[in-house]
UniProtKB/Swiss-Prot annotation:
Pathway: Purine metabolism; AMP biosynthesis via salvage pathway; AMP from adenine: step 1/1
Keywords: Cytoplasm, Glycosyltransferase, Purine salvage, Transferase
Biological processes annotated in GO: adenine salvage; AMP salvage; purine ribonucleoside salvage
Reaction equations catalysed: AMP + diphosphate = 5-phospho-alpha-D-ribose 1-diphosphate + adenine
Pfam families: Pribosyltran
Gene: apt
Organism, scientific name: Beijerinckia indica subsp. indica (strain ATCC 9039 / DSM 1715 / NCIMB 8712)
Protein name (database record): Adenine phosphoribosyltransferase
CDD domains named among the record's database cross-references: PRTases_typeI (cd06223)
Amino acid sequence: MNKPIDLKSAIRTISNYPKPGIEFRDITTLLGDARAFRRAVDELVQPWAGTKVDKIAGMEARGFILGGAVAHQLSAGFVPIRKKGKLPHTTVSIAYSLEYGLDEMEIHADAVVKGEKVILVDDLIATGGTATGAVGLLQKLGAEVIAACFVIDLPDLGGAKKIEALGVPVRSLISFEGH
């Protein structure tokens, strides 16, 4: 009999990366383990199985991997949210806050139809700057963002609370204390 997969132990932690004092949560080890990847996707999908979801929006880059798998499981379309200048057609953009300043992300202007139910998916939520920007971008196009889903939450950084304050429920599979 197969032993149950512990998602937390499937994620590698790299100390002092990308700078001293940071504990980097490397999800590539989970993605490379077929059983762990499958379990993570199944758990992200489970609350919405049987629910009408029009689109899954994934943030560059690991949100593309997870979001594509979730979209497939839910028979929903997939919408990439990218850094400014990376999409080839007419776009809508939004500026968002990072720990170290501002950045911009964009989405194709025709990626979401007003009223579509969208779930935002990414690998990790920390301060919530990127996810807050993505929610704002989707809402700018008229989407109803029904949830934001992450494999990892770093609750000490408060990002999930920022998303919930926007009226968007947050689902995270595991959490790591600290940064």
